[in-house]
Curated annotation (Swiss-Prot):
Protein name: Phosphoribosylaminoimidazole-succinocarboxamide synthase
Cross-referenced Gene3D superfamilies: ATP-grasp fold, B domain, Phosphorylase Kinase, domain 1
Pathway in which this enzyme or protein is active: Purine metabolism; IMP biosynthesis via de novo pathway; 5-amino-1-(5-phospho-D-ribosyl)imidazole-4-carboxamide from 5-amino-1-(5-phospho-D-ribosyl)imidazole-4-carboxylate: step 1/2
Assigned EC number: 6.3.2.6
Length: 254
């Protein structure tokens, strides 16, 4: 097989040229970072689990007609995705106070919010992904008003669906981060959900104990990060085919 050309390497994933025009291969790494790279480490098997969890959730979203960049999983660490023009915004959906929201507003962590809150952050590691308003987004033309309407609608629909899915398996969806991209089909432009949905970009707490089951375990040096990710996969019924045995998985098939 011809070696694929690497196009981009981020903190948790690598993008390679896809087998067909308009496609990419997304490879999930075991690398973990926090504080925009200020803290880094390796969580063995994280890439394998995130690949499976994200595949499962993206396919479920497809079933309710939420468009995503996901096409299919290729192997334990890679999935085929549609190439999109990424909108330079992180869209954070919050149901329960935690993380930066608790710090900024002095709301005790774990307080259920009176309504779902959507926040926007400008994707720029050098600036620390600053929080921005819709006024900033419009002024700097990061996204058109129609793009924002589409992203907000998709974010809220995704939230409603995922909240129900996680509640059914005893997990509280505290908050999560989404990224979106544009794709052109002839003259028509559509907004798709991109990136991933996994314990790397969702805050997930056990519904009974509030035990953290996400990357906060790494951020806060709580330990048992791998076990937490495995527990999420187990509750969703999607551990790797080999079970817990080989979470390292193969290297990228290039």
């Amino acid at each position: 097989m011809a070696r694929r050309r690497q196009l981009y390497e981020g903190k948790a994933k690598v993008l390679f040229e896809g087998p067909e025009p308009g496609t990419l291969v997304q490879y999930f790494k075991d690398d973990a970072t926090a504080g925009n790279g200020a803290k880094s480490g390796i969580i063995t098997g994280k890439g394998v689990l995130n690949n499976r969890i994200s595949e499962y959730l993206m396919l479920k979203l497809h079933e309710i007609n939420i468009p995503t960049h996901f096409i299919r999983r290729l192997n334990m660490r890679e999935q085929l995705i549609r190439e999109v023009e990424i909108i330079p915004l992180e869209v954070v959906v919050r149901n329960v106070a935690a993380g930066s929201l608790s710090k900024r507003l002095g709301i005790p962590e774990g307080t259920r919010l009176p309504r779902t809150i959507i926040e926007y952050y400008y994707k720029n590691d050098a600036l620390g992904d600053p929080m921005v308003s819709e006024e900033h987004i419009a002024a700097f033309n990061w996204a058109a008003p129609q793009d924002m309407d589409d992203m907000n609608q998709l974010a809220l629909r995704t939230n409603d669906f995922l909240m129900g899915m996680f509640t059914a398996v005893g997990i509280t969806l505290v908050d999560f981060k989404l990224e979106f991209g544009r794709i052109w089909e002839g003259e028509e432009m559509r907004i798709l959900l991109a990136d991933e949905i996994s314990p790397d970009n969702c805050r997930l707490w056990d519904s009974k104990t509030n035990e953290k089951m996400d990357k906060d375990r790494f951020r806060r040096d709580m330990g048992r990060v791998e076990e937490a990710y495995q527990e999420v996969a187990k509750r969703l019924g999607i551990l790797p085919e080999s079970g817990n045995g080989d979470l390292k998985g193969p290297e990228a098939v290039q």
